[in-house]
């Protein structure tokens, strides 16, 4: 793994977006076959590195943070990859720097490992820091499970064994994942015997070396009691998360279910869960004993990953091979659909500017009021001017404002653009800007909600995808957001009320109904 003066675009063809987070974007990359770098390598590159995932993190600091070899000079074409230290970046970049530091630890102490994502290379340019990662094209853990014709404890133990093997490797390197959940476990390929990889180390920490750089946010389903109470986080915290995953794999629902978020927090802190007879009567006692040991409130009493590698159930020796009750699979399918919707939303609202975005936009443009036909014209100009129909660069955004004859807004273009360039990739979703402007006109009520919804319903089908719901939530007026939305688990509580038929899409009526059932939103949005 090396870092040199080449540009990312010299080595890789970057294509479609695979996923987005609050601070990053992941795209598919294909290694070019005619670049000088490849010719200087060994006879041929492995197939696994020809197709990669490229994760772009916004730029760390104000200068090149990846120092070069002293003997290589400024014109060295290739040098060993170095990583920025915490001193080289501002505190605001700590989260992203943390991911790079943890990935360095993985490269040095874990890779290559069949159950941990591999980092091939790192590039840095004006757009940010690019991590060239192993491409996992086999889908998420739960997606694979619910698509199987046959599902039994044996299949569940097989995937759990792989997660345990990955955890054992990173724990041996003193790395705590801190965000273990189904969406962070991906299959390498679509093959039946594909290995399962643990990925996304953005929230991870190294014991006795780095401090966790973020607090709790979003879902608390997989969060350990010690994390919830802000106690000491250790590798045993990951084992609790594994226990939650295993419980869901064997039942189709999470172990801690409550009427509201506060009750759920208390249940987790007390370790209050049950094996309901109707669901669990067909599950082996070995599996239930394993779950009970993992979901023990005292971290010291939980088994380690190393200990679990020799557990008879994890090894498949005591896992039942009988096909599970179809109702369990059906519940797992419904749970998976809701989980993916929530995950998309939580990823989208992970930014320090999100909840103040519309408020800041109002302060920038003042009393400028867009009429409905102007908003529609703005949409048309975006589509006409922008090379990528949905995403606009700063230059394209300025061209749109000029075409719309909005000279008074042009001086603020860069600042408005920056409000919506959430992952710092140099582009913004034009629909978010449209929602922001429409929110200036209608800052509350059902009309504002419907306006934002229609901005994303581009095919006028009457429903939007889970990713679009997340983006819409991100662009809603500041006044439409409940004051406790950053409270751990609050988004879970809201999104549990959406997607009533679990089809992965949300209609306006479903979205509105969820708002009506949530008193904190109802008072503000629908009053």
UniProtKB/Swiss-Prot annotation:
<feature type="binding site">
    <location>
        <position position="459"/>
    </location>
    <ligand>
        <name>Ca(2+) 2</name>
    </ligand>
</feature>
<feature type="region of interest" description="Disordered">
    <location>
        <begin position="59"/>
        <end position="78"/>
    </location>
</feature>
<comment type="similarity">
    <text>Belongs to the protein kinase superfamily. CAMK Ser/Thr protein kinase family. CaMK subfamily.</text>
</comment>
<feature type="domain" description="EF-hand 3">
    <location>
        <begin position="486"/>
        <end position="521"/>
    </location>
</feature>
<feature type="binding site">
    <location>
        <position position="55"/>
    </location>
    <ligand>
        <name>ATP</name>
    </ligand>
</feature>
<dbReference type="GO" id="GO:0009877">
    <property type="term" value="P:nodulation"/>
</dbReference>
<dbReference type="InterPro" id="IPR011992">
    <property type="entry name" value="EF-hand-dom_pair"/>
</dbReference>
<keyword id="KW-0472">Membrane</keyword>
<feature type="binding site">
    <location>
        <position position="510"/>
    </location>
    <ligand>
        <name>Ca(2+) 3</name>
    </ligand>
</feature>
<dbReference type="GO" id="GO:0106310">
    <property type="term" value="F:protein serine kinase activity"/>
</dbReference>
<keyword id="KW-0175">Coiled coil</keyword>
<dbReference type="Pfam" id="PF00069">
    <property type="entry name" value="Pkinase"/>
</dbReference>
<dbReference type="InterPro" id="IPR008271">
    <property type="entry name" value="Ser/Thr_kinase_AS"/>
</dbReference>
<keyword id="KW-0418">Kinase</keyword>
<feature type="binding site">
    <location>
        <position position="461"/>
    </location>
    <ligand>
        <name>Ca(2+) 2</name>
    </ligand>
</feature>
<feature type="binding site">
    <location>
        <position position="423"/>
    </location>
    <ligand>
        <name>Ca(2+) 1</name>
    </ligand>
</feature>
<feature type="domain" description="Protein kinase">
    <location>
        <begin position="12"/>
        <end position="314"/>
    </location>
</feature>
<dbReference type="InterPro" id="IPR011009">
    <property type="entry name" value="Kinase-like_dom_sf"/>
</dbReference>
<comment type="function">
    <text>Protein kinase that recognizes the calcium spiking induced by Nod factors and translates this signal to components controlling nodulation and mycorrhizal infection responses.</text>
</comment>
<feature type="domain" description="EF-hand 1">
    <location>
        <begin position="408"/>
        <end position="443"/>
    </location>
</feature>
<feature type="binding site">
    <location>
        <position position="499"/>
    </location>
    <ligand>
        <name>Ca(2+) 3</name>
    </ligand>
</feature>
<feature type="binding site">
    <location>
        <position position="432"/>
    </location>
    <ligand>
        <name>Ca(2+) 1</name>
    </ligand>
</feature>
<feature type="binding site">
    <location>
        <position position="468"/>
    </location>
    <ligand>
        <name>Ca(2+) 2</name>
    </ligand>
</feature>
<keyword id="KW-0547">Nucleotide-binding</keyword>
<keyword id="KW-0112">Calmodulin-binding</keyword>
<feature type="compositionally biased region" description="Low complexity">
    <location>
        <begin position="41"/>
        <end position="51"/>
    </location>
</feature>
<keyword id="KW-1133">Transmembrane helix</keyword>
<feature type="region of interest" description="Calmodulin-binding">
    <location>
        <begin position="337"/>
        <end position="350"/>
    </location>
</feature>
<feature type="binding site">
    <location>
        <position position="421"/>
    </location>
    <ligand>
        <name>Ca(2+) 1</name>
    </ligand>
</feature>
<feature type="binding site">
    <location>
        <position position="505"/>
    </location>
    <ligand>
        <name>Ca(2+) 3</name>
    </ligand>
</feature>
<keyword id="KW-0106">Calcium</keyword>
<keyword id="KW-0808">Transferase</keyword>
<feature type="modified residue" description="Phosphothreonine">
    <location>
        <position position="279"/>
    </location>
</feature>
<feature type="binding site">
    <location>
        <begin position="18"/>
        <end position="26"/>
    </location>
    <ligand>
        <name>ATP</name>
    </ligand>
</feature>
<dbReference type="GO" id="GO:0005516">
    <property type="term" value="F:calmodulin binding"/>
</dbReference>
<dbReference type="InterPro" id="IPR018247">
    <property type="entry name" value="EF_Hand_1_Ca_BS"/>
</dbReference>
<feature type="region of interest" description="Disordered">
    <location>
        <begin position="25"/>
        <end position="51"/>
    </location>
</feature>
<protein>
    <recommendedName>
        <fullName>Calcium and calcium/calmodulin-dependent serine/threonine-protein kinase</fullName>
        <ecNumber>2.7.11.17</ecNumber>
    </recommendedName>
</protein>
<dbReference type="InterPro" id="IPR002048">
    <property type="entry name" value="EF_hand_dom"/>
</dbReference>
<feature type="domain" description="EF-hand 2">
    <location>
        <begin position="444"/>
        <end position="479"/>
    </location>
</feature>
<dbReference type="InterPro" id="IPR000719">
    <property type="entry name" value="Prot_kinase_dom"/>
</dbReference>
<keyword id="KW-0479">Metal-binding</keyword>
